[in-house]
């Protein structure tokens, strides 16, 4: 099956998580007016008694054509990925309880100035780079037992 890749926007992505960006977002000044603070851009949730981790993930580019055959989700915490050098990347997401609901399967491409924060329990494809090795600032939950993986029928990503 073919899955069309769409431009990422907060409106289109809102059921799956948050788009982390400054474009069209409110800010306030701090540090004697030298800094614009774009405050609270994503809902970060960490359940149970684990801690929030800030990491850097170095992702390798995926082979083309890109075929999706599994999704994962994290029931105990959100997961955010922010490219550190302005790279474009692709995300694949779906809703669903015990298994991904393929009627909600969507693919999005960022504009190079966006990150994403997956809500808890949102099915998504594991992180990969789009066109070159990409470093992602990653904010997620430490601890174990927070990753469910499900196979899905193969989906080939299509770029318009």
From Swiss-Prot:
Pfam family, one: Ureidogly_lyase
GO biological process: allantoin catabolic process; purine nucleobase catabolic process
Domain of life per record: Bacteria
Cofactor dependency: Ni(2+)
Subunit structure: Homodimer.
Functional description taken from the UniProt entry: Catalyzes the catabolism of the allantoin degradation intermediate (S)-ureidoglycolate, generating urea and glyoxylate. Involved in the anaerobic utilization of allantoin as sole nitrogen source. Reinforces the induction of genes involved in the degradation of allantoin and glyoxylate by producing glyoxylate.
Family per record: Belongs to the ureidoglycolate lyase family.
PANTHER family from the UniProt entry: UREIDOGLYCOLATE HYDROLASE (PTHR21221), UREIDOGLYCOLATE LYASE (PTHR21221:SF1)
Protein's name in the database: Ureidoglycolate lyase
Origin species: Escherichia coli O139:H28 (strain E24377A / ETEC)
